[in-house]
Amino acid sequence: MAVLNIYNLAGEQTGTVEVNDAVFGIEPNKVVLHEVLTAELAAARQGTASTKTRAMVRGGGRKPFKQKGTGRARQGTIRAPHMVGGGVTFGPHPRSYEKKVNKKVRNLALRSALSAKVAAGNVLVLDYDGIETPKTKVIVNLVNKVDAKQKQLFVVGDLIKDYNLYLSARNLENAVILQPNEIGVYWLLKQEKVILTKEALATVEEVLG
């Protein structure tokens, strides 16, 4: 079974924990990772880009000049797509870019991403009894001690209990704090170190195991 190191808030290793190989020890499926990552990035798009067709542009109701006798090419409206100020042909309109991803496929992608992180030694467990008052320097000291100085993904099990941890970590420039139900492939791949609280680890194993 895969084994994760357990640390306290001081950054000292206090033990290890065996985790479910079905969640943290599988062979990463790159095809599924790409599919789910693409879907997550697509779903994050606003989809508000909009243009007006010739039917939507103001004006252009009358023929700009007579059909014959001017020597110019015939025109029926000043709002045709080839005219300055005219409508746009095949331009974007508000739409949803979301792609359907089956639950089993998404879970496989999450397990693949977590397994890749574990194989690289970039997942650790945080065991602590809470923080009395929010202090960013406590978290700075922690990430320095566990060699997680670059980009950190904190996964907390209970945002009420872990609220001071959230307040302490959110000041870090490259830190992201999520709950287990918010974890996505994008953040697992983007952030260098994944730091799970014990409660979050139990939830992740229960949901994905």
Swiss-Prot record:
One of its GO terms (molecular function) is rRNA binding. One of its GO terms (cellular component) is ribonucleoprotein complex. SUPFAM superfamilies: Ribosomal protein L4 (SSF52166). One of its GO terms (biological process) is translation. Residues 60-71 have a biased composition (Basic residues). One of the primary rRNA binding proteins, this protein initially binds near the 5'-end of the 23S rRNA. It is important during the early stages of 50S assembly. It makes multiple contacts with different domains of the 23S rRNA in the assembled 50S subunit and ribosome. Forms part of the polypeptide exit tunnel. Belongs to the universal ribosomal protein uL4 family. This is Large ribosomal subunit protein uL4. It comes from Fusobacterium nucleatum subsp. nucleatum (strain ATCC 25586 / DSM 15643 / BCRC 10681 / CIP 101130 / JCM 8532 / KCTC 2640 / LMG 13131 / VPI 4355).
